[in-house]
Structure formats: C-alpha cells, structure tokens
C-alpha cells in the first residue's frame, strides 16, 4: 500500500512539473494522461523553466533519496542530455537535521560505549546535515599529555536503510516498466542506472568502508604539500559512526575568502589538476565526489604561497582496471598529439567497442570532435568535455563503458571546474601533459618492471616448472592441427599465416619472460662475481636479453 501511495505521489509531481514527456510512448504516459485533470497545473514560473530545471525541482520535492538519485544521474552524461546533466549538478544534498540526542544514541549503539565515556565533549547541534548522514563536532578524552583532540563524528540517519530500500524497490519497478515499454530503453538502460545508484548508496551507508577509503587515500598522500587527508580515529569508528580528525579550511569555491587569506590561486589550480591525474594513474584510487563542497583549501597562513587542498567525504572512490588505466592514459596522449587514428584504435583495443567497427570511420568521428577544440585558446580547452564528446560520438558505434570510467568523466569535469574557478586562465593541457608523460614513463620503466617481477617471484617460481611442458603441449597441438587442415581458400591461408606469426610471438615472449625471471632470481640470490652497481652483471645480461625478446614480440603485433 505504501508503495502505491509513493508511486501516486511521484506521478503527481511528474505532472505538476510537466515532466510527462519523459515517459512518452510508455503505458505510464496513458495513466498520467488520465490523472492530469485531477492534478493542479504548474505555475507560470515553473512552466517557464527548462526541462532540466523542472526535473531538478521535482527531485528536490520528492525528497533526499531522489536528490541523491539526481546527483548520481548527473554523472551519466552518456545517457542524459547535456543541458539536463548540467542542471542536475546544481542539486544540493542539504536537508533538515535530525535530533542531536538521537545522534548520541546511534553513536553509543555503534561504538558500544556511552558518548560521555567515548568523548570528552559531543555537540548535539550538527555542523552539517545531508540525506544520508550528519556531522557533529566532538573532542576525544585527554591523551597522555593531557591534550583533548578535536574530531568530527559522521552519524547515519536513523532508519535510513529502510527508507532507501523502499525507494530503491520502487525505482527498480519503474525501471523494469520503462525497460519493457520505452522506445529508447536500450539507450537509457534504466535497470543499469538504478543498479548503479543502489551500489553507490550501499557504499555510502557503510561508514567503516568510508573510513577505510580515507585511510588508503591518506597513506598515498602522507607528507604531501598538495593534498591533506584527515586521519581516521579507528577506535571511535563503526558501520554507523565515523570519527575523523577535525580540519579547518576554506571551501575551494569561496574565492573572496581565498583572496582575503592571500592564497595563491594560480598555484592551487595547477595543483588540483596534478593531484587528480596522480590519483588516477599513479595510485589508481581517486576521489570520485570531488565537488567544491568536498574540497577545501588549507587555511594555515604559512601555506599562502604553497597552498594545499584538504579532501573531505570519502564515500565514493574510483578505481580503474590496469587495462583501462593504460588505454585512458594512451588516449589522452593521442589527444595531445592529435593522433586520431591511434585514438580510434585504442577505443577498439580497450574493448570499449566491437572489433568489427571500421577504424577509418571512428578516426573521422574523433577528428570531427577534436579539431574544433584545437582552434580555441588553450585556457578554454576542456579535456573532460573532449573525452565526454568522444564517448558520446562513439555511442553510435555501440560503445560500452564501465561505470568506473563514467565516474572518472564526472570527476574530471568537477576538477576542471574547480581549477578554472580558481584560475580562469588555467591551461589544463599544459599541466596534465607532463604529469601523464612522467607517470607513463615511471609506470613502464625497466626498474618498475623488475620490481613487479620481484613481487611476483614466488608465484612465477611456483608455475615455472610447468611452463616447458605446457608450451610443448600447446605447440604440439598447433602442429598437429595445421597438418590436419587442408588449406584452400585465401581466408584460411591468411589465418594460417596469422597463427604462424602468433606462434612465433608466443615463443619469443615466453623466452623473454623466462630470461627476465632468471634476471630477477639472480638479483635476489646475490651470487658471487661481477656487479654493475648493486646488480649482478649476469642479471643485467639476462634482463637485457629478456627485454629485447619481449620488445621483438611486441613489435611483431
């Protein structure tokens, strides 16, 4: 019954904000048409608004869970029009706070201690309140030196899980209906969108997981002059309560306060771009909710000329597969070099597009997207917009993107927005390019390869004895299979040639890998004999020969 009443209310809001066109061609449109005479017409002020603004206002009226839904939907620029996405980014996740005494009870239940024991003080008036949780100021009991450390405690709303489950169940029902009846369901993919929203909300409901995210990010940026991450107080953290070191700063979009504090905004803007690319390509762990409210600037007067950011809210973090990391970095470099052919090839090699796509057509599409940008001043070029438009054009060719890549698009857009707000003349390309080049050099350097081999040495040594037998068995099967096939057609001849080349490449690659294993073993054993630096000469020779063999195998692609 509650679900029916909730669905009825959603229908009334859709009609009042003139959003029924979104359901055109579905059974829901017919039901809404019947209900239309009984719903008050939209005011002239609402009717004059754009469709994106009307959707934003409707979501705000439907409540905090739908606000969160709109915020997540704003990241899916591959699914919704750009004007609607822009409007949805304006959604503010601010709601009326819940009772401070209720917050105390939740903290006590989570920590298994009375608040008066766990904390020296706990302010029942929240510092901030959102749809999932609210934040309270507190101090820890005195330490050995008698110091009471300032902290903040993030507390989940009471009964929030039940509310979310009910709304998500309703969204699943609506998504199923849209998928069955909407003429563009294959493009919108409603069930996929709702599943993504459900996953994001589930992550935000586990504050212990958020604490782990903060802890990992802090470890990556320990001692950095570019980014500070508050310390997690694990003794006072549980699934429904997260305690962090209290930090003080200025929101990154408060330009007046930044200028009053004498902050070097130009240096700060460049640092923001560098931090983002380092998180993505060095650490593979990036803050994926990096809007101005979650990015502060350290207000310490001593940091005026060497400012640093402070990260807040670690509920949504992003990671890419190693393959996506590589292809994305290569894609950016291809954009920098205006190598449209390589961009097209990378989209296919990454598995983002079907292998039967014509590369020349994709190359022409990439050229049509990028060339107009290259005629603009560098300060007006947005790498995020180029990437989004590339992916949007590629949708015509059955582009398939992982949710993490879509999350990265949205984060890049936010970071560029923050950077340009701090420094309107920021040249994103000039800042990003050297960072990408350095990270790619480091990522694929011989030293790093040897280090990774060293880490995987136990695994390699475990499987190494089986390799000759497996290779011999595979080659024997190839030879026997080739003798059994009577090749007549040009296609089969071409296939045979490809198999021969593949066989040669596999043997060369296995030989190279074996030599690198030998090099790593020699390095680990510290044998007697000649050394070059701290590495045995024979390790250098074996490693060099192995690298050469792998290079030959790679060049024969």
Curated annotation (Swiss-Prot):
Molecular function GO terms recorded: ATP binding; protein kinase activity
Residues at which ATP binds: 127-135, 154
Key words of the record: ATP-binding, Cell inner membrane, Cell membrane, Kinase, Membrane, Nucleotide-binding, Transferase, Transmembrane, Transmembrane helix, Ubiquinone biosynthesis
Pfam families reported for this sequence: ABC1 (PF03109)
Pathway, per record: Cofactor biosynthesis; ubiquinone biosynthesis [regulation]
Bilayer topology annotation: Multi-pass membrane protein
Annotated InterPro entries: ABC1_dom, Kinase-like_dom_sf, UbiB, UbiB_bact, UbiB_kinase
Cellular localisation: Cell inner membrane
Residues annotated as the enzyme's active site: 289 (proton acceptor)
CDD domains noted in UniProt: UbiB
GO biological process: regulation of ubiquinone biosynthetic process; ubiquinone biosynthetic process
Family affiliation: Belongs to the ABC1 family. UbiB subfamily.
UniProt protein name: Probable protein kinase UbiB
Taxonomic source organism: Xanthomonas euvesicatoria pv. vesicatoria (strain 85-10) (Xanthomonas campestris pv. vesicatoria)
Gene: ubiB
